[in-house]
């Protein structure tokens, strides 16, 4: 099996395609199990965020992964990237460190990678290969962020959106802000808003208790999601980031809110993928809609300023990729030896148990020992004997040369391993 990563992100696909390829809520474990069920796949993990959807798999080839993803979201092939082996390792290290993020060095992605690992592990789609890779990824990301300033004073998509709101509303502290959701992105937005002060903070969420917790931390008011439409007209600024599969805020709702506000402008930030706010809201006069793709331009200055730290982190990743691949190669070289030892041990234990039973049944010891010796010799030598016989028929000089090194001629031994009789156990 080969290590593959297949995916699309904010650099290769626009938000409307990314939302089609997103796996949110209960869809993620179902998708994982479906992916792992493919005969070509032995291990699988799925990373799905607002900016990327990526499949990590131990698979025979990549075509089956592409076909599977396009079954979920058609017409993606022109927007996909794929990496294998060392380049797949490098890609995951860079993603977890924040080097492949829209906001360079943003810290949320490491937690999202850990969540992807935890979900895959909980649903039994990880094996030793991917599990080892993710564990090493966490270690590399921690080191890169500790040894460089790539994660210093991080700028998130949420903080960028809040800054834009502050720039757009000279007196944001006199405005009412509505937050939809209670996940990490909304938590960050609430934190930045409470630091800058707003007149009134409303937090709407499907699970009211989560909204109440967030509201108590930041001096806001919690609302059930069912009350969203009723309070929409009160909001000067809206931030939304949920895992809903369908838009929560429609064009009709915003039109109605604008009429109730007597056309007073509204600023809306849709930080979710799939999107929470209907795209056509941006066509309304007095409604100003920003998506995560719009925010990419706003964070470009931050990206340039953090490039030096990113270069240092890239150097750490290069070194860690080389070490990880070297370890994998060393393990691969050891694998045949481990299989050989395991085969020898299991054969010995099986035949020894059989011999002990024969002695217990009263069979003469000399006869038991002779049968044990013959059976052990034949069982251990049958696989190499058969392989060497095929090599001789196929003129496989590489294998016969290796056999000469493994079985050198010595006094008292046959001149060639081919001369061992291929007898069955008695």
From Swiss-Prot:
Organism: Xanthomonas campestris pv. phaseoli
Annotated site (Important for activity): 91
Catalytic activity: (S)-4-amino-5-oxopentanoate + tRNA(Glu) + NADP(+) = L-glutamyl-tRNA(Glu) + NADPH + H(+)
Quaternary data: Homodimer.
Record function comment: Catalyzes the NADPH-dependent reduction of glutamyl-tRNA(Glu) to glutamate 1-semialdehyde (GSA).
Annotated region described as Disordered, given as residue ranges: 404-426
Entry remark concerning the domains of this protein: Possesses an unusual extended V-shaped dimeric structure with each monomer consisting of three distinct domains arranged along a curved 'spinal' alpha-helix. The N-terminal catalytic domain specifically recognizes the glutamate moiety of the substrate. The second domain is the NADPH-binding domain, and the third C-terminal domain is responsible for dimerization.
Gene Ontology molecular function terms on file: glutamyl-tRNA reductase activity; NADP binding
Record lineage: Bacteria, Pseudomonadati, Pseudomonadota, Gammaproteobacteria, Lysobacterales
Protein name, entry field: Glutamyl-tRNA reductase
Binding locations of NADP(+): 181-186
């Amino acid at each position: 099996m080969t290590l593959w990563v297949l995916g699309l992100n904010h650099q290769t696909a626009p938000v409307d395609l990314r939302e089609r390829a997103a796996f949110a809520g209960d869809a993620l474990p179902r998708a994982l199990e479906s992916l792992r069920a493919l005969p070509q796949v032995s291990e699988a993990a799925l990373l799905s965020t607002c900016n990327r959807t990526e499949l990590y798999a131990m698979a025979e080839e990549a075509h089956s992964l592409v076909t599977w993803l396009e079954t979920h979201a058609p017409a993606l092939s022109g927007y996909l990237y794929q990496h294998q082996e060392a380049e797949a390792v490098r890609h995951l290290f860079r993603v977890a460190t924040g080097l492949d993020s829209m906001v360079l060095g943003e810290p949320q992605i490491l937690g999202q990678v850990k969540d992807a690992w935890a979900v895959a592990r909980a649903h039994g789609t990880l094996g030793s290969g991917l599990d080892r890779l993710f564990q090493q990824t966490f270690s590399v990301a921690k080191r890169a962020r500790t040894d460089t300033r790539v994660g210093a004073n991080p700028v998130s998509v949420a903080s960028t959106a809040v800054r834009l709101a502050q720039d757009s509303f000279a007196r944001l502290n006199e405005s009412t802000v509505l937050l939809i959701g209670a996940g990490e992105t909304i938590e960050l937005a609430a934190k930045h808003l409470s630091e800058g002060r707003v007149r009134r903070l409303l937090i709407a969420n499907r699970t009211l208790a989560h909204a109440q917790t967030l509201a108590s931390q930041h001096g806001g008011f919690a609302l059930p999601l069912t009350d969203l439409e009723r309070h929409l007209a009160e909001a000067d600024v809206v931030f939304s980031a949920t895992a809903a599969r369908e838009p929560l805020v429609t064009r009709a709702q915003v039109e109605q809110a604008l009429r109730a506000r007597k056309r007073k402008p509204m600023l809306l930030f849709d930080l979710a993928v799939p999107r929470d706010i209907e795209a056509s809201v941006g066509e309304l006069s007095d409604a100003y809609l920003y998506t995560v793709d719009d925010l990419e331009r706003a964070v470009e200055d931050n990206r340039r300023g953090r490039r030096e730290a990113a270069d240092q982190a890239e150097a750490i990743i290069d070194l860690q990729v080389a070490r990880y691949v070297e370890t994998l190669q060393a393990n691969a070289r050891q694998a045949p030896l481990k299989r050989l030892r395991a085969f020898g041990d299991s054969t010995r234990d099986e035949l020894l148990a059989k011999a002990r039973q024969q002695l217990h049944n009263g069979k003469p010891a000399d006869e038991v020992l002779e049968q044990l010796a013959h059976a052990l010799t034949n069982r251990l030598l049958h696989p190499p004997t058969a392989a060497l016989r095929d090599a001789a028929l196929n003129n496989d000089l590489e294998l016969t040369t290796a056999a000469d090194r493994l079985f050198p001629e010595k006094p008292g031994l046959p001149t060639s391993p081919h001369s061992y009789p291929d007898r069955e156990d008695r």
